[in-house]
Amino acid sequence: MSLAAVAREIHYSKSALAYFETGERTPPPDAIAWYEKRFGGLKDPVAALADLGKADVERRTFLRAGYSTALSASVLLPGWIDPSPRTVGGAVRNIGRADVSAVREVMSLFSRMDQRMGGGHGRTAVVQYLTTEVVGYLNGTYTDNTVRNDMFSAAAELAYLVGWMAFDNDEHHVAQRYFSTATKLAAEADDAPLTGHVLRAMAHQAIDLGHPEEGLRLAEASVTGARYRTASPRERALLKVVHAKALSAARRPADAARALLTAEQDLAAASAQIPEPARVFFFSEASLAHETACALRDAGDLSGAAAQFELSVRKREATAFTRTHAVTLGYLGAVQADQGDLELACATWSSALTAMQGVQSGRTRNVARDIRNATAAHSNSTTAAINQIGDQASQYLAAHAT
């Protein structure tokens, strides 16, 4: 559907709609409500999840192509992240604790696969499970209300994971719909920390796509009230790190530094004695160092950024977190090149490209593309490895084209 066609229906000008969709202006509530009605509001999250998964598997165009700031902003409207009355369908048997555990085991399996192999691997399998087994559970009857809430929470985590995998594979409009659905499922479960977890992913996406104001709104929503207050220390640290990322993107370096300090304190408070959700298994000292390095790099502190990227590389378990390890190495190489040490940068980039072999991820593709462009810009350098590294990056991109 073209902008002109949308403009005829909603009675906003094409230029106004373009501003809304690019994030240059915040869409008013009536525009957001119209987008949701026209392109698929999520009044019943279970039905929405089933429809979304079916459309995803069949690769249908179930949303206007591209990221829409209006859709992500809609989750911040009053009443959006609230449970909605539903009629629960019948089931062959009661859904119990073992069923919840099964969903969580699947979530853990595919989360770890995503960390190693990237979001381009296995998403269809997760969607099939989500829209058959899990939707069946959500439409079932439960042994008690605690089990019901736990099942909705598990389903929300799985929907979030599918969204994260799509985000990682540069399928941003798909990711956005899953994230929005996950917030509604989390609300049905009355799971405030999980809602915050999904909102910080949406903030991350908005920032990466060049919508800093939208990213900051979502990040601030993720650390508001019970979403942050009732989260475990490790999850609070994750929420605060993305909040810092958003503040940095909004050119508020002092506020970003304070948020990073809070994240560091939260992570230090995490311990084996404090229960925490399995979904935060990936967030560690290496993750915090990576985000701190990004903030320092963006603020122009190349020496500080290099030190933090190096710390992240040392602390991360590379085999279990292959994708992020490769990305961190790529970023470190770029900082080293900016510092004028092309020989060291080439060695680091070579390690990054070796690490990302077999990883199907938009983020590793972006790193490889940046490496190729950087080496091309220095093709006349006396550094012997420069052209070899550029060729290696081109080979990765050719082998992992989407």
Where are the regions that the model predicts?
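Short alpha-helical DNA-recognition segment
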Residues: 1-19
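Short, conserved catalytic or interaction motifs in soluble domains
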Residues: 22
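Compositionally biased, long intrinsically disordered regions
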Residues: 41-99
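Conserved binding/catalytic microenvironments
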Residues: 90-402
